[in-house]
């Protein structure tokens, strides 16, 4: 969700100039003064009540909520309902007057101050984006350049209405007789607005147009894809914005997946989408009727800890899920499948990387019946390679002989006992690349290792046009290069690991989905929203979802719409993952609790 609404952000930021920023900053300064005054007054109310309680032998904690005792009130965590004084304070003769004054003051100023805080608290993020956008435009003007990703925006500015179709569109429409657009569920509203007039011109000239897509496979909203365009077209809703008259046809035959998996997906997703107000067409299985294997493994930390007597009780759900996933791989290997027949699909790249390292450790330890030989274009970080670590720690020790961590790793982990000879290395008279090549030669680093080769390639790019200073490179390694991935090409009899996004359109005999317990609504990251306030110069603002529930109806509707779209996004991801297998589907996740959070009958995770 960190990348949601990029088009909105880009559009608004691109229209804000330096003079506009001055107005915005002036509004922000005034608004935040009001917020601070509101917080100050609430804290004064709290301290006054506590003083009255102390003077009259009353226990202040009986009348003030613990979260704000001692005047700890902040608008950041404040809710629409006043939770400062407890109702008991209103019934105490000494406190009732103060209780009424506080509630009246809170009710009068809370909503206004909460709005101001949400709009202006992160104003410097907006200023930074505006500065970057203006600097980008200056650089493009200097180079007489144009970014290809801005093409849609440029066309959008030209195509202002149906009555003003540009000359080139008329010419193209008269020549193209048939138009087909595939994967239409990932089309952005901006792109569709540009194409729509071309399609209308084509149809008016006697041609034909067809769009293909599946709203259930729309998983690129973070890249401005909007499944609602396809849904409106399929429903024949020509009155909706950006729509035209259509005839919808469902292609329901499934020739990929065994019947039992198709039937399961029909039952699961028809109910799940129905709860979101979306009716979907069920698929008709055309392959291996009565066949197909579905497996679910649930992990429970509490149960597992109690059953493993004598072991440490610091088990994590992630550890158990990795063990359970490995057991699923073993199950299929024991039943005649090869590693080449399988794929592991992950919602998050971080989980993919963690599991890839786990499998590598299993292979290196040699304690299991099978070798897993994991491969992925997304999993393996440079910093995870022992050979690369050796190079980097040697560089660190050369740069600073007092680096005890580097010294310990080289001596105890890598088993290098002759660190004194590193004193002979003269970094002032040799380039960084030559220094690394000498390290590879002198310390028996495997020069053919794929990680070492990737490290050398990235080092060469770094050194091109930059300082060869060792300290600068170590900073670059810590900040950036250590997090870069290495593509491990698929070899014969290797296990492929992918994110769900990368697996779209592909098929596999066996699909295993570890960590299948992600949140359907993400409250961890801020989302950029358009400002609903007419008098504000701020066009957009970032906010978490929860605070928006605590303002008024306009903000409530805004956040409910975002939560709804996130549920659809994550359900679509689940659908894409569950429809990749041909014969077998395995799901691994933590055991859901009885009181799992849900909203409108739909689970949060």
How would you label these PLM feature ranges?
Residues 418-433, 443, 491-495, 547-604:
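C-terminal accessory regions
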Residues 1-145, 592-605:
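Conserved ATP-driven helicase/translocase motor core recognized via long
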Residues 45, 125-178, 190-194, 325-328, ...:
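Conserved helicase/translocase P-loop NTPase motor core
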Residues 523-564:
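Conserved catalytic motifs of ABC-family nucleotide-binding domains
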Residues 385-423, 543:
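Metal-dependent DNA phosphodiester-chemistry modules and their immediately adjacent helices/loops
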């Amino acid at each position: 969700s960190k990348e949601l609404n990029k088009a909105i952000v880009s559009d608004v930021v691109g229209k804000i100039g330096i003079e506009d920023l001055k107005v915005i900053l002036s509004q922000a300064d005034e608004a935040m003064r009001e917020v601070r005054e509101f917080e100050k007054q609430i804290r004064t109310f709290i301290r006054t009540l506590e003083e009255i309680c102390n003077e009259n032998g009353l226990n202040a904690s009986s009348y003030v909520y613990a979260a704000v005792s001692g005047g700890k009130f902040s608008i950041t965590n404040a809710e629409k309902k006043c939770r400062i004084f407890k109702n008991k304070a209103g019934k105490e003769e000494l406190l009732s007057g103060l209780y009424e004054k506080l509630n009246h003051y809170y009710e009068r100023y809370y909503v206004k101050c909460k709005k101001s805080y949400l709009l202006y608290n992160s104003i410097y993020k907006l200023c930074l984006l505006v500065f970057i956008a203006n600097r980008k435009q200056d650089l493009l003007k200097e180079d007489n350049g144009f970014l290809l990703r801005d093409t849609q925006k440029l066309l959008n500015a030209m195509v202002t209405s149906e009555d003003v179709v540009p000359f080139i569109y008329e010419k193209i429409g008269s020549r193209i007789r048939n138009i087909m657009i595939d994967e239409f569920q990932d089309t952005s509203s901006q792109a569709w607005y540009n194409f729509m007039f071309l399609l209308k011109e084509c149809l008016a000239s006697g041609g034909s147009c067809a769009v293909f897509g599946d709203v259930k496979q729309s998983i690129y909203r973070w890249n401005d894809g909007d499944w609602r365009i396809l849904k409106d077209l399929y429903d024949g809703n020509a009155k909706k914005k950006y729509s035209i008259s259509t005839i919808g046809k469902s292609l329901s035959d499934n020739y990929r997946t065994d019947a039992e998996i198709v039937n399961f997906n029909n039952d699961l997703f028809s109910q799940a989408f129905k709860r979101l107000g979306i009716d979907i067409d069920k698929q008709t299985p055309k392959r291996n009727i009565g066949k197909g294997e579905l497996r679910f493994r649930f992990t429970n930390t509490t149960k597992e800890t109690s059953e493993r007597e004598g072991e440490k009780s610091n088990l994590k759900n992630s550890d158990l899920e990795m063990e359970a996933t490995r057991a699923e791989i073993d199950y299929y290997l024991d039943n005649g499948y090869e590693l080449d027949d399988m794929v592991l699909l992950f919602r998050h790249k971080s989980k993919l990387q963690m599991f890839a390292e786990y499998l590598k450790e299993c292979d290196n330890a040699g304690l299991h019946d099978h070798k897993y030989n994991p491969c992925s274009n997304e999993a393996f970080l440079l910093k995870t390679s022992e050979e690369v670590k050796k190079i980097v720690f040697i560089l660190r020790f050369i740069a600073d002989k007092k680096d005890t961590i580097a010294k310990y790793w080289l001596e105890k982990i890598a088993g290098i006992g002759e660190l004194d000879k590193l004193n002979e290395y003269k970094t002032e008279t040799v380039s960084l690349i030559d220094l690394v090549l000498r390290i590879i030669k002198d310390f028996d680093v495997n020069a053919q290792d794929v990680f070492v080769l990737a490290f050398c390639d990235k080092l060469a790019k770094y050194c091109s046009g930059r300082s060869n200073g060792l300290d600068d490179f170590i900073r670059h390694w810590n900040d950036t290069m250590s997090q870069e991935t290495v593509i491990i090409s698929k070899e014969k009899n290797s296990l492929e690991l992918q994110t769900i996004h990368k697996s779209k359109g592909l098929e596999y005999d066996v699909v295993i989905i570890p960590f299948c317990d992600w949140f359907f609504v993400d409250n961890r990251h801020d989302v950029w929203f358009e400002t609903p306030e007419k008098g504000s110069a701020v066009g957009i603002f970032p906010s978490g979802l929860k605070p928006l529930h605590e303002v008024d109806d306009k903000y409530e509707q805004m956040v409910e719409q975002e939560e709804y779209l996130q549920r659809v996004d994550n359900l679509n991801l689940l659908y894409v993952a569950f429809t990749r297998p041909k014969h077998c589907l395995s799901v691994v996740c933590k055991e859901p609790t009885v009181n799992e959070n849900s909203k409108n009958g739909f689970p949060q995770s």
